[in-house]
Structures are given as C-alpha cells and as structure tokens.
From Swiss-Prot:
Subunit relationships: Homotetramer. Forms heterodimers with either ThiH or ThiS.
Pfam families, A to Z: ThiG
Keyword terms of this UniProt record: Cytoplasm, Schiff base, Thiamine biosynthesis, Transferase
Protein name as catalogued: Thiazole synthase
Gene: thiG
Catalysed reactions, as listed in the record: [ThiS sulfur-carrier protein]-C-terminal-Gly-aminoethanethioate + 2-iminoacetate + 1-deoxy-D-xylulose 5-phosphate = [ThiS sulfur-carrier protein]-C-terminal Gly-Gly + 2-[(2R,5Z)-2-carboxy-4-methylthiazol-5(2H)-ylidene]ethyl phosphate + 2 H2O + H(+)
Lineage of source species: Bacteria, Pseudomonadati, Pseudomonadota, Gammaproteobacteria, Candidatus Pseudothioglobaceae
Role this protein plays: Catalyzes the rearrangement of 1-deoxy-D-xylulose 5-phosphate (DXP) to produce the thiazole phosphate moiety of thiamine. Sulfur is provided by the thiocarboxylate moiety of the carrier protein ThiS. In vitro, sulfur can be provided by H(2)S.
Species for this entry: Vesicomyosocius okutanii subsp. Calyptogena okutanii (strain HA)
Catalytic residues, chain numbering: K102
Length: 259
C-alpha cells in the first residue's frame, strides 16, 4: 500500500503524532517533550493555558512558537455548546484569525465522555462561522459520520476515557469509523503507552493525539521519543499489510530436500 500524507483542512503535515501541552511540571519540560516528539500540531486548552490572555503570566507561545508549530486551540473544560463556541471565538482573536480548532464538549466530570448532543450543535455553528473543526467524539460510527457530514475536517474518537491510559478498548468501532470516513480519523484520549499508539495506527487511523501518556510518564521526554517511533512503526505496519492469522503452525523453512 502506498502512503498518502496527512492533510487536515488543506494543510499537509509530516508527523502523525499530535501532542498536548498540559500536565507537565513546568514550561521547560513542556518544551523538551514537545521537541522530542517532533509533532507538527500542538493542542492548547484555551480555558486553562495562557497564550496571551494574561499579560502578567508566562505565555506558552514563548516556548511553543506558532512559527514552528500549528497551534490547535481546544475547548477542554466546556460542558455545553455556548461555552465551547465562545472559547473558539476567543482563540481566533488571540491567534489572529486562526480557524483550526479542536472541539471538545464533555458530558460529566467523572468520565469526561463527550456530550454528543452539544457537540453536534456546536460543530454546526462553528462550521457555519468559518472554523475548521477537529472534533472529539465517541466511538459511535453513526455519530462520527454525522459530524463529517456537518463539515468537520477531522474526526477524533476516543480510544478510552480521557487520561485513563486504558488503550483502545473497542478497536472494532474505530475500524468502522475509519472505513466510512472521507476525512482524517485521529485517536484522541486513552492512550497509555507506545504499543497503544502503534495499535491505533495499525487499525488504519491517520494519527493520534495524546497528552497524559507523555506528560504523566516517569520520563516524559523519553516517552515522547517512544511515541514518535511507535506512530511511525504502526503506520509502516499498516501499510505493509500483516500476515494472515492461521489456526495451525506453518514452518518458515521448506520441508523438502532435508539433509
């Protein structure tokens, strides 16, 4: 299979690993891990991170430059469409007309599961207002297709609950979403280790977004490197086409003309 580049909202990206900017012990660790990951897209929680709203506080953009990275503002912490839309509008103002955003509307504080009703409502309004919407959603393929039909530029189903590190709990659903999508499908939430990231890519996903898996590791910088390599390995494995599973053994060497 021939690889095709990752294209989101008509822009081509080299890396299929997207990383978050939160949960690190300080901005220096954020920078070191981000550099090691070699990601092109860095997501930022507008309601929790200073990117210019507070002039007297450290600005994330001083170490994660928009000239080097594509900044992906997200609506983490929003529980309804109104707040999410307002947050996206603020991000557009702070980033000088930036239209690429990650829509994330949560259902409750215990599971952080997406509120699909509010997500669908907000997605339509944002698309109608010129935003390029990458959307966090459940692993329901019908919902995913509806979000695509609304005009979202990327579908981002969860692998498992945000920050849980449980990995991909329902791979069949993820494969169904990917099979029916005509926009990029990127895993968002639940990745815990490098093998989880590789598995997501082997399922055919176009990329993986993660934060906790790197930031909460004992060695975030080393884990960033592991995730970078896992994404590459998983993609190459998918493109290669794995061997068929068999019920019985099959010798690697021929069984004729033996000594």
């Amino acid at each position: 299979m021939i690889d095709i580049p990752l294209v989101i909202a008509k822009k081509t990206y080299n890396s299929r690993l997207l990383v978050g900017s939160g949960k690190y012990k300080d901005l220096n660790e954020t920078k070191l891990a981000t550099d090691m990951a070699e990601a092109d897209i860095i997501t930022v929680a507008i309601r929790r991170t200073n990117i210019g709203q507070n002039v007297n506080e450290p600005n994330l953009l001083d170490i994660i430059s928009p000239n080097k990275y594509t900044i992906l503002p997200n609506t983490a912490g929003c529980y309804n469409a109104k707040d999410a839309i307002r947050t996206c509008q603020l991000a557009r103002e702070l980033l000088g007309g930036h239209n690429l955003i990650k829509l994330e509307i949560l259902g409750d504080k215990k599971t952080l599961y997406p509120n699909i009703v509010e997500t669908l409502s907000a997605a339509k309004t944002l698309v109608d207002n010129g935003f390029d919407v990458m959307v966090y959603t459940s692993d329901d393929p019908i919902v995913a297709k509806e979000l695509e039909n609304i005009g979202c530029v990327a579908i981002m189903p969860l692998a498992s609950l945000i920050g849980s590190g449980q990995g991909i709990t329902n791979p069949t659903q993820i494969k169904l979403i990917k099979e029916h999508a005509t926009v990029p499908v990127l895993i968002d939430a639940g990745i815990g280790c490098a093998s989880d990231a590789a598995k997501a890519m082997e399922l055919g996903c176009d990329g993986v977004l993660m934060n906790s898996a790197i930031a909460n590791a004992n060695n975030p910088i080393l884990m960033a490197s592991a995730m970078k390599n896992a994404i590459i390995a998983g993609r190459e494995s998918f493109l290669s086409g794995r061997m068929m599973k068999k019920s019985y053994a099959s010798a690697s060497s021929p069984m004729v003309d033996l000594i």
